[in-house]
């Protein structure tokens, strides 16, 4: 099939027990996961995006066997756990995955931490890097305001980017961090899958749904191409974290041509209600 046309990291949330809010799919079989991993590897996908909250994923990977084909990134929740317990959990995950280190470790739910906890979390990450547990360290955020309380110890910021949410592209602090070497990784490009099937969006967002459909129609794009065009048309985020429900989906993403739209920033909506742009506020179906 060839190599992926974008710098892609394979998100692994869908491989566990339950994922998403508006699109619930049956738990994926180990056989399907193995197909996805093989396809990803064959097409130059180098990194898997994990988290300690992805229930059952590590166990499945240990059973399938990753065979050291991928770099591993993970995320941890710092606030309610001690550094010692987190370190033990990370060591346990590495052992289960037969890996020596993580490519990256990010603090999950950065906004939930107090200022003192954030300082402590950064020290924790720095110590892990010094010990060789991770090559790179960073944070996972939801809103651009969260960038105001980090420092240059951070090397990676994982943040949402999609048709309904492009705030980071307009943010001065994000640009300054990127200029100073911080790598921005985009997630949620399909907005929990709703941009691939707009009928799954709540009925009270009919206007926003129609606008996205018209955006795709105007540029002659499928819903998949329309969603990916947001990443393709910007230069802040250098890596795209994507999740899939089967190998066919991954194949479609890999084959989807890069579509850069010069007017993208002028066409995407801004100032949308948080009830639409933040999946944490959605009601599970």
Question: Language-model segments: what does each one mean?
Answer:
Residues 42-45, 99-102, 134, 154, ...:
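A structural motif
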Residues 110-277, 281-284:
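Beta/alpha (TIM)-barrel catalytic core signal, keyed to glycine-rich beta->alpha loops juxtaposed to Asp/Glu
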Residues 6-11, 48-50, 70-74, 102-107, ...:
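Hydrophobic faces of well-ordered beta-strands that scaffold small-molecule active sites
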Residues 94-114:
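Active-site groove signature of glycoside hydrolases
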Residues 25-39, 82-97, 141-148:
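Short, acidic/polar
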Residues 1-70:
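N-terminal binding-site loop/beta-alpha segment at the start of enzyme catalytic domains
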Residues 49-59, 79-84, 112-116, 163-169:
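Acidic-and-aromatic substrate-binding clefts and catalytic sites of carbohydrate-active enzymes
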Residues 2-4, 61-71, 91-100, 148-152, ...:
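Acidic (Asp/Glu)-rich catalytic clusters
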């Amino acid at each position: 099939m060839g190599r992926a046309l974008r710098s892609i990291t394979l998100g692994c949330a869908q491989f566990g027990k339950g994922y998403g809010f508006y699109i619930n799919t049956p738990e994926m079989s180990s056989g399907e996961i193995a197909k996805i991993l093989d396809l990803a590897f064959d097409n130059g996908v180098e990194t898997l995006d994990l988290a300690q909250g992805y229930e059952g994923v590590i166990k499945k990977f240990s059973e399938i066997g990753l065979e050291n084909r991928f770099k591993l990134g993970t995320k941890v929740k710092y606030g309610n756990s001690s550094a010692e317990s987190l370190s033990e959990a990370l060591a346990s995950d590495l052992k289960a995955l037969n890996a020596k280190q993580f490519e990256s470790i990010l603090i999950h739910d950065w906004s939930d931490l107090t200022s003192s906890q954030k300082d402590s979390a950064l020290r924790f990450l720095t110590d892990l890097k010094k010990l060789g547990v991770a090559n790179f360290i960073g944070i996972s955020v939801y809103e651009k305001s969260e960038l105001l309380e980090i420092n240059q110890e951070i090397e990676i910021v994982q943040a949402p980017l999609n048709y309904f949410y492009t705030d980071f592209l307009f943010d001065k602090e994000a640009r300054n961090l990127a200029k100073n070497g911080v790598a921005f990784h985009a997630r949620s490009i399909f907005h929990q899958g709703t941009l691939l099937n707009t009928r799954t969006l709540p009925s009270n967002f009919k206007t926003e749904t129609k606008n996205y459909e018209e955006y795709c129609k105007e540029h002659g794009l499928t819903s998949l191409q329309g969603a990916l065009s947001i990443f393709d048309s910007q230069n802040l985020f250098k890596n795209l974290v994507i999740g899939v429900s089967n190998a066919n989906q991954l194949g479609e993403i890999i084959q989807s041509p890069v579509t850069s739209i010069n007017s993208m920033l002028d066409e995407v909506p801004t100032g949308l209600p948080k009830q639409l742009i933040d999946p944490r506020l959605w009601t599970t179906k």
